Amino acid sequence: GALSGPVIGGILTIVGFGSFGKHLFNCMPIMVGATFMSYITEHTTQEPAILIAILFSTTLAPIAGRYGTLVGIIAGAIHLTLVVNVGFLHGGVNLYNNGFAGGLVAGMMVPILEAIHVHRVARLNPQRPEVDPAEEVETLS
């Protein structure tokens, strides 16, 4: 697609958040999933709105960093699907679309993934004491 102002802004946003732990290995699975979803739907990566959505989908990079590449690809695909379908809620403003869609994806996936992760860790390491995720959250506050 064209290298326009919003696309450059998206690239600079990714670079800026690099100081907070966003890097190639947790951004690429998300972007691959979003790009894959754009190819199997009627949207093309030449559209500026889709390019911006793919760039801002890296808001889900912590999910790929914690739960792995496959989960990151799935999160990116779900993110792009939501971005193109929730635009009517706030007049098509892409930044709001991406933030809202990222929040929905994280809100849906993280509790499920955390429950699976806790049980998987307990199964792989039987000597480790059982941990309740709710108690872990309570101790953080």
What is the predicted function of each stretch?
Residues 1-121, 133-138:
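Pore-lining transmembrane helices
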Residues 125:
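Catalytic phosphate/metal-binding cores of nucleic-acid and nucleotide-processing enzymes, i.e., regions
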Residues 129-130:
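Transmembrane helical cores of multi-pass ion-transport proteins
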